[in-house]
Amino acid sequence: MKKAKGLIILAAAVAVIVLVVVIKNLTAEKNYSKKYAGYDLTADVQGLGRDDSYVKYLEKYENAPIAQTAFSINAADFAEAEDAYIMDECGGLTNVLYTGDSSEVSWKVNIPETGMYNIFVKYYTVSSRGVEVERAVYINGEIPFHGADDLSFSRIWTNNGAVRTDNRGNQIRPSQTERFEWQGQYLKDYMGYIVHPYKFYLEAGENTITFKAVNEPVILSNIDFCVITEGTGYEQYAAEHASERTSAEAANAVIKINGEDAAARSDASLYAKYDKAAANTDPYSITATILNYIGGDPWKVPGQWIEWDFNAPADGWYNITIKGRQYYERGAVSGRSLYIDGEIPFKEVETVEFKYSNEWETLTLADANGTPYKFYLTAGDHKIRLEANLGELGDILNTLSDNVFRLNQMYRKILVLTGANPDKYRDYNLDQVYPEVIEAMALESKRLYKVIDDCVEITGQKSDKIATALTLAIQLERFVEDPDEIPKALASFKENIAGLGTSILSMSEIKLDVDYIVVQGTEADKVKDRVGFFRNAWHSISSFFATFFVDYNAIGDVYDEDDEEVIEVWLLSGRDQNEVMKMMVDDTFTPNSHIKVNVQLIDAGALLSAVMAGNGPDVVLTVDAQQPVNYALRHAVEDLTQFPDFYDVVADYPESSYTSYKFEGGVYGLPETQNYNVMFYRKDIMEELGLEVPQT
C-alpha cells in the first residue's frame, strides 16, 4: 500500500513539473518588441557611446550624394613617402610603388565632385611572414572612422605540387605556397560585420589620402575611387543577357569541380581534407585516406575565400549546385558570396546560405520559389570563388560590438566610484552620482532585446550564443529598477559583458565544408546525392570490418621494420601534425640521409609499457617536458651528449629551454617548442584616455 502511495505521489510530482514546463513554454514571450517599441534606439546618452563608429560616420553624411565620376591615381605619384620607393617593373606592370612594413605614403588627390566613394586598391604581395597585409587609411590627416585604421589585404595560396600517394594507397596533401600576382580589393571591414565595401566621404578639390603600414610590406599599382553601385538584381542580369542562346552542348553539359581540387585560397590553412564518416563523399574510400573535401574549422572567418578553375565547353546558360555541409553550429547559418571570374553576377548570390544539417546537402542556387538561377558563361576557362560572408548577421554583430563598447564604458564609470570590490554596506547613490549611466542602462536593455529579436528572425530560433545578451538585458532592467543592486552585482555584470564579447566572436565563425560544385546546363539532370538506409548500413558495416585489417595509426609510407636503414618514430600529438611531420621527413630528411622513417600515431599511455617490454620506438616526439628525465632514471633513453654534433645542434637553443632535460651530466631530450609571454592592452581604454601606446 505504501509503495503504491509513493508511486502515486511520484507520478503527481512528475505531472506538475511537466505542466509547469508546458505553461512556461506557452506563456514565454515569442519576441520582446513590447520592450523597445516606440523608443529611439539610435540616440546615445551624453558621454556614453562610440562617436567614431562607421554607423555614426554614415549618419553624419547621410545626405551626401553618391559621386558619379570614377577616377584613379597611380601609387607612384605620391606627394610624401617614408620607407617606400618606386620600382621600374613588377609582375608585368611598370612604375609601381613598394611600401615597407613601417611605411607611410601620402597622395594629393584632386577630387572632381563632392560625395561618397568606394576605394579599390590594386596590390602585389611580397615574400615575408605570410600573414595578411594591413594598412590604416587617413583622409586629410585623420582616420575617418573606427575600422579604417585596420584594413586587411589577403594573400593567394596554392598547392606546392600535386597530391602524393604513399605505398599504402593513402593520399598526402601537398604543402601550401604563396602565389605572387597582381590582385585587387575594396577597402572594407576586416571583421566582416560590414558586408559591403566602406563608403568614404570626399569633398571636391584637393584632398590628402595617406596609407600607413600596420603590418607587412606590399607593392601598390593604383588606387581607384569608384562609383558606389547597389549591384545588379537577377531580373536585370537576365534581361542584359536575354539575347544569349544556349547550344545543345552547353544545355546538357555537366562540369563537376571537386572541393579538394581548389586552385587558390586566401589562407594556407584552407587545404584539402578527408572524410571517412559519410557514405556519399566524392571520392569515397573506407580503407584509404582519400582527400575528398575542403573547408571545415579553418574556413570560418569572414573574408576568407577558396577558388576553383573550370572550363565551360560552350557558350550558354548554366545552373550551379554546391554540395556542402554546415554541421558545426545548430541554429546558425553559414553564408558564402559567389564570385564568377572575380565578380558577383547579381545581388541574390551576394550571400548564399547553408543551414545547419548533420548530412551533406546539395544546394542548387535558386530563388525563393525554388527556380534555379541561370548563369551565362562563354566557352573557355573560368574561375568560381566562394567567400565567407556574414550576410544579415553582420549587422547584428556590428550592433552587439557597439553594445559591448557602451557597456564597458558604463562598467568603468561605476568602477571609478566603487572600486573593483564594492563595500556591500555602503550606499553609493549611483542614480544621483551617475544619472546618465542609469539612463544608458535603460536604453541599452531595450537595444539588447531588439538585437535578440533580430537574431531570431534571421536564424529561426534562439541560439545559445545570444543567451548572454538576454541575461544582460534582464540584469540592466533590474539595475534601473533598483540602482542599489549594481555594486552587489558588479562582478557578475563584468562577467556578462565579457561573455557577450566571447559570444560575438563565436557567432562570427561561419564554418562550412564543400565536397564538390556542379556547373551544369539547364537541360541536364538535376544533381541528386542523398544517402539511403541500405547505403548507410553498408558503409557502417564495411567501416567496422576495415578496422581489423587497416593500421590507422601508421602515417604515410610504411617500410619493413627489419630494414637496417629504417627508424621508428612515435608521435603523441594529433593526426594533422603527424602528417605534416611525415611529409617533411619524406620530402627532405629521407632523400638527403637515405634513412627511411616509419611514423606512428600512438596514445601517450601506451609509451611506457612498450618501452619496458622492449618494443619501444627509436624516437618519440611531442612528449611532456618531464618525461625525458623520468625515462633517464630507468635507463630507457640515450644521452644525447654522446653524439659528436650535439653541441652544434643545441647552439641554436637557449640553454634554459633544455635545462629540464638534464640528468647527472647528460641531456635526454630536445625542446620542440618554447613558450613566451606577451602583453595585451585595452585599446578602448587607451582611446578613451587619449593615450598613445608606448613604443618601448
Regions found by a protein language model. Name each.
Residues 564-568, 572-629:
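Early extracytoplasmic/lumenal segment of secretory-pathway proteins
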Residues 604-638, 651-668:
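Pocket-flanking alpha-helical
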Residues 532, 598-602, 641-644, 662-696:
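Helix-loop-helix "hinge/cap" segment bordering the ligand-binding cleft or interdomain interface
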Residues 3-518, 522:
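Extracytoplasmic
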Residues 549-568, 664-665:
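Immediate post-signal peptide segment of exported/extracytoplasmic ligand-binding proteins
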Residues 271, 576-580, 679:
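Short, solvent-exposed loop/turn elements at domain surfaces
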Residues 499-556:
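Extracytoplasmic ectodomains of secretory-pathway proteins
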